[in-house]
Amino acid sequence: SDPYYTSGLIVMVKKDDDTIKGFSDLEGKRIAVQIGTTGANKAGEVKNAKVTAFNDNTAAAMELKNGGADAVINDSPVLKYYLQQGGSADAKVVGAVMNSEDYGIAVKKGNDKLAAEINKALAEMKQNGEYDKLYKTWFGEEKK
């Protein structure tokens, strides 16, 4: 389908850490990631970093909270959701979103009719304001 959300990778650190301001400050640091994510791939590009992979984002965030990691790299909505659910007491996101990844609704290859119907519904929701309401509800911020 047409994209309904644009995401990207972001860095999360302990709330009181002012030494890491973004991705460029991660050289030589301990980075926690979620297995099989683009964040795990990106962390592998950091020079002299010790990257530890976890089964889920909560475990990676706990590693940060417990002092076993200096930072977590994951998709922006994943980390922002973690912060909204109480993680903001201990952590914060820093720096700019590192890349751009569009989210869409997958349909079976060749099912052009369904894809067109989905795209039409998305366009209608954007036109009538429903998309903006849902975006704010589920992503916790205004569409930029």
Please identify what each model-predicted range represents.
Residues 14-30:
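Flexible hinge/capping segments at coil-to-helix
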Residues 5-13, 80-122, 139-144:
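Periplasmic-binding protein-like
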Residues 14, 34-37, 56-57, 73-83, ...:
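Beta->alpha turn/N-cap motifs
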Residues 24-25, 45-46, 58-77, 85:
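Short helices/loops that flank or line small-molecule/ion binding pockets
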Residues 18, 35-38, 52-66, 100-101:
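Short helix-initiation/N-cap motifs at beta->coil->alpha
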Residues 26, 64-65, 105, 118:
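Hydrophobic residues within well-ordered alpha-helices
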Residues 38-52, 91-94, 117-144:
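Ligand-binding clefts/hinges and TM-proximal coupling segments of bilobed small-molecule sensing domains
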Residues 30, 70-71, 104:
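Short, Asp-centered acidic motifs that coordinate Mg2+ and/or phosphate
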